[in-house]
Amino acid sequence: MSSSVSEECTPAKKKYDACFNDWYANKFLKGDLHNRDCDELFAEYKSCLLKALKTKKIDPLLEAARKED
């Protein structure tokens, strides 16, 4: 698994990736489409990413790109 955009978010990304991969292989492919085991880990990773994007001043670039669509 790759590192996160921000080094401080890599541990949260790795936890989420492991959870997602387990869910996908062991639940989703067996028909359990509504499992929410990884939601909390995703929220933690997303929060870290959003904070890092603001710190690195990347968030204005993302907003501008979204407006172009």
Swiss-Prot record:
One of its GO terms (biological process) is mitochondrial membrane organization. A motif (Cx9C motif 2) lies at residues 38-48. GO terms for cellular component: cytosol; mitochondrial intermembrane space; nucleus. It comes from the Eukaryota. PROSITE patterns: CHCH. The keyword Magnesium does not apply. Disulfide bonds join 9-48, 19-38. A motif (Cx9C motif 1) lies at residues 9-19. InterPro entries: MDM35_apoptosis. Pfam families: UPF0203 (PF05254). Residues 6-56 form the CHCH domain. Keywords: Disulfide bond. Belongs to the TRIAP1/MDM35 family. This is Uncharacterized protein C119.18. It comes from Schizosaccharomyces pombe (strain 972 / ATCC 24843).
